[in-house]
Amino acid sequence: MSATKSAGPTTLANHLDKEVKTDVLGAIDSDKLTEATQGDHKAINEEYKIWKKNSPYLYNVVIATVMDHPTLTVEWLPDLFDDITPGSMSARLMFGSHSSGLDKDYIHVASVELPTHLRPETIGLLSQQEGGTDMKQHHDAHGRHKRIAIVQSIYEDGEVNVARYNPLASKQIAAAHVTGDIHIFDRNNIMNSKEEAKPIYNLKHHTKEGWGLNWNINHADQLVSGAIDSTVAFWKIPEAASDGSCKDVTPHTVYHHDAAVNDVKFSYKMDFLIGSASDDCTLRLWDTRKPGNKAACTIKESRGINSLDFNPHSEFLVATGSADETVKVWDMRKMDTPISQLYSHCDEVTKVQWCPHQPSVLASGGHDRAILVWDIARLHDDLSSDENDEGPPELLFHHGGHSSRISDFDWHPTLPWVIASAAEDNVIQVWRMAESISNDEAVPADDVDMED
C-alpha cells in the first residue's frame, strides 16, 4: 500500500488541525521553518502543506526539529532508556553540523523522546545510566518541551561529512572530515566542551574528502572508507594507547576506482567482503582475504552509483542507488543483471538501506526530497487499476516530509519501522509509518499518535 492510499475520517483531520493549529509537527519552530524554506519554490511548499495535512493518516509518529546548520550524516545509536515521562522512552541519535566555516562544527548526540508502544515486547532497554532511566526533561530557550534535544557535543575542527559508531564497541565513533582524515573518538570520555575533542585514533590516507565509512559488524577492529580521491581504504585498528594518546593509523589495504568513491560497505554475512560504489559507474566487490587489490567482481551501470547496502538477512543480496534515478537489487551469484529495478524517484538516488527487521524491505532517498520504502516481496503482486495508478507494487510508502534534498537517513536497529532522516534545509525528522501501511491491516483512527 502506498502512502497515497491512506485515509481517515474528516473529523479526525479537523480535530488535529484545531489541536496543533498550523503545525502538525509541533516540534518545528514556525519562524525557523519559514526561514529554512523561504527560498524554495511555491510547488514545494504546496507539497509540504498537503503532506502535513495528511500526516495523521500516514504515520504513528512524526517528530521534527530544525537545527542551526544542516547535517550530512545521521545514525541511531543502540541506547534506549526509560524516560521520566510516563509512557515514553528515550533513544539516541547521532548527527553532525556542516556550517561551511561560519561556525564551530560538532558531532552531536541527541535524546529523542518516543512512545513506548513503538518498542516490541521482546526488546529490553539498553542503558548506560543507573536504573535505566533518562532523568531529564529537555526544554528549549522558551521553556517548551523538546522531543529532540542535544545531550552531547563533540567539537571538531572542521566539518564532518559522515559519522558512524562501532556496532561492537558503541562508545567508539569514527568521523570522516572534509580534509580526508578520519578520527575515532571514545564518546564516553568526552564531555561537552568548546575545546577541540581529542581522538584516540587518526586515520591518514585519503587526500580528498569522502562520504563512505562503515564498520565491520563482525570484527570490532575493521573499518572501511571511501573518498573523492578514487580510493577505498581497508583499516585494521590497533589497541588503543594505554595513556589515552592519539595513535596514527595507516591502511591495511588500498583499493582503486577510476573516479570518486561515494559509498563503501562490509557484507553482514561474509565478513571478508567489501563493496564500493563510484562515479565511474561501477559497483566493485573486494575480498580482503586475498593479497593485492584486484576486484573480485565489477558491475557496470550507465551512470554513477551513489550508494550500496548488503542485505543483513541474505548473504547474496545487495542493493544500489544510482544517478539514473533507480534502485537496483542484485544477486551476487549472478551479477550480469539486477533481479529487481525500482522506479519512482525523479532525481538521483543518494542512499539505500535495507530494513534490519524485514528481509524484503529497503528504503531509498535522494535529490527529489523523498524517502521511499520498498518491499521487493510484492514485486509480482496483482494490483487494481486504482492501485496501479499510485505506483509500482513494490512501493510501500512515500515519505514526503522534507522540502530539500535528503542528506542521510537511518533505520532504528531495534525499533521496527522507525526511521530518522535529515535534509539540506536543516530539518531532522523521526517517523514511523502507520501500522495500517506496514502491516497491511486497518488501525482505528484513535490509535494514531501524532507526536509533537
Swiss-Prot record:
Protein keywords: Chromatin regulator, Cytoplasm, Nucleus, Repeat, WD repeat
Query: What cellular component GO annotations does this protein have?
Result: cytoplasm; nucleus; Rpd3L complex; Rpd3L-Expanded complex
The UniProt entry annotates WD repeats at 155-195, 205-245, 256-296, 300-340, 344-384, 401-441
Where is it mainly found?
A: cytoplasm
Listed SMART domains: WD40 (SM00320)
Cell compartment(s), UniProt:
Cytoplasm; Nucleus
Record keywords: Cytoplasm included?
A: yes
List residues traversing the bilayer. Answer: none
Q: Look up the domain of life of the source.
A: Eukaryota
Q: Which InterPro entries match?
A: G-protein_beta_WD-40_rep, Histone-bd_RBBP4-like_N, WD40/YVTN_repeat-like_dom_sf, WD40_repeat_CS, WD40_repeat_dom_sf, WD40_rpt, WD_repeat_RBAP46/RBAP48/MSI1
GO terms for biological process? chromatin remodeling; regulation of DNA-templated transcription
Q: Name one GO molecular function term.
A: histone binding
UniProt key word Chloroplast: no
What's the subunit arrangement here?
Answer: Component of the HAT-B complex composed of at least HAT1 and HAT2. The HAT-B complex binds to histone H4 tail.
Function in brief: Regulatory subunit of the histone acetylase B (HAT-B) complex. The complex acetylates 'Lys-12' of histone H4 which is required for telomeric silencing.
Family label: Belongs to the WD repeat RBAP46/RBAP48/MSI1 family.
Q: Which PANTHER family match?
A: WD40 REPEAT FAMILY
Question: What protein name applies here?
Answer: Histone acetyltransferase type B subunit 2
- Name its species: Yarrowia lipolytica (strain CLIB 122 / E 150) (Yeast)
